């Protein structure tokens, strides 16, 4: 997704900053959840960071700012540990211009055409922060909000209340995102939301993955399998045309494991496409994707209850963002597999609905499973 200008009106001062995890460090093996202060905002609100460790020594760090994933430490086939998510060592990077590294995006993840949608006969105007379109909830989406965190047995639950009219959306929306790190080496995301007025909801996590390690170069040598056999065709601004096309053996076809870079030059601007998942039974987890780094042997499998998955190859990373360890994140240094409803669904009644009404509960689950071989 495109970088966007940070529009925070207040300058944010930091304190008590916490250094990022170092590649190659052997993790502890006692399962735990520990909380620290990552920094402090100018209104004196703390930003908390939680370290979740499972019994196998797999470790994730998550923060209240943007209900975000900061680090994910995973061993390779030889047991060497690396952080496989792009991001920053310190909080200040997340408070300034960045491409949604690891954060929860909403109220509506992905694009809404021309920054407007009509619901129950009323048209709602939203910010156009991605060319002519609305992207990831607007100028101050869920990624730029400080959530409340609560440690659980093997994870953290984050909650946020989005006020009626925030970023132009109707209804007071109460949102929860729970991160769980299981002893099966799964990082699980569970989303819930309720509203007091009809609204639209589409939530995802915008982690950028590099299974060779954050900052280890581009991901074009990763091998990807995408199980869906169809994708939503888009115009030149990333908005669906309404046509759902078959991957049919072309550059979009990852139904069999394929190096991401193999057909990359055939896709104008790189991959940034929503694949259509055959979800089957409502609420059931369905295998959506698998990615492998041949050099390290690390493997990540993705399953979800969502009807779509956005495959994005970090096309707008240009070296201007300095991330973990002082690395300049260049084009294609990370890939995103964002589980979601389709882009522009509020304006496409033929797509799976993103409407949420009072008395209903939005629920969604996505699981990332890690291994090495």
Predicted region positions:
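Bacterial N-terminal signal peptides
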Residues: 7-17
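Boundary at the C-terminal end of the N-terminal hydrophobic targeting segment
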Residues: 19-21
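An exposed, glycine/acidic-rich loop-and-rim segment of catalytic or binding clefts
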Residues: 23-58, 64-373
């Amino acid at each position: 997704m495109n970088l966007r200008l940070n529009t925070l009106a207040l300058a944010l001062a930091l304190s008590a900053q916490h250094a990022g995890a170092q590649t190659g460090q052997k993790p502890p093996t006692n399962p735990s959840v520990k909380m620290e202060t990552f920094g402090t905002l100018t209104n004196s609100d703390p930003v908390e960071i939680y370290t979740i460790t499972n019994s196998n020594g797999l470790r994730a760090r998550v923060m209240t700012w943007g209900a975000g994933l900061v680090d994910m430490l995973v061993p390779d086939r030889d047991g060497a540990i690396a952080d496989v998510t792009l991001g920053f060592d310190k909080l200040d990077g997340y408070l300034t211009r960045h491409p949604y590294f690891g954060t929860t995006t909403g109220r509506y993840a992905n694009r809404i055409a021309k920054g407007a949608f009509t619901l129950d006969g009323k048209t709602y105007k939203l910010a156009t922060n991605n060319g002519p379109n609305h992207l990831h909830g607007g100028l101050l989406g869920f990624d730029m909000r400080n959530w409340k965190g609560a440690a659980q047995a093997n994870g953290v639950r984050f909650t946020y209340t989005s006020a009626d009219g925030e970023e132009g959306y109707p209804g007071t929306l109460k949102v929860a995102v729970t991160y769980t790190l299981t002893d099966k080496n799964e990082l699980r995301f569970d989303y819930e939301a309720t509203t007091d007025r009809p609204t639209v909801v589409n939530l995802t996590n915008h982690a950028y993955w590099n299974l060779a390690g954050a900052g280890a170069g581009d991901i074009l040598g990763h091998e990807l399998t995408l199980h869906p056999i169809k994708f939503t065709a888009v115009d030149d601004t990333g908005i669906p045309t309404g046509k759902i096309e078959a991957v049919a053996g072309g550059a979009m076809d990852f139904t069999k494991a394929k190096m991401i870079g193999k057909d990359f030059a055939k896709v104008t601007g790189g991959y940034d496409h929503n694949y259509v998942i055959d979800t089957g039974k409502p609420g059931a987890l369905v295998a959506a994707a698998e990615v492998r780094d041949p050099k390290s042997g690390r493997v990540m499998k993705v399953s979800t209850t969502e009807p779509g998955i956005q495959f994005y190859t970090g096309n707008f990373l240009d070296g201007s963002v300095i991330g973990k360890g002082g690395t300049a994140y260049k084009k294609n240094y990370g890939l995103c597999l964002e589980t979601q409803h389709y882009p522009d669904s509020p304006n496409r009644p033929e797509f799976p609905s993103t409407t949420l009404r009072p008395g209903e509960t939005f629920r969604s689950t996505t699981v990332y499973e890690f291994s090495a071989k």
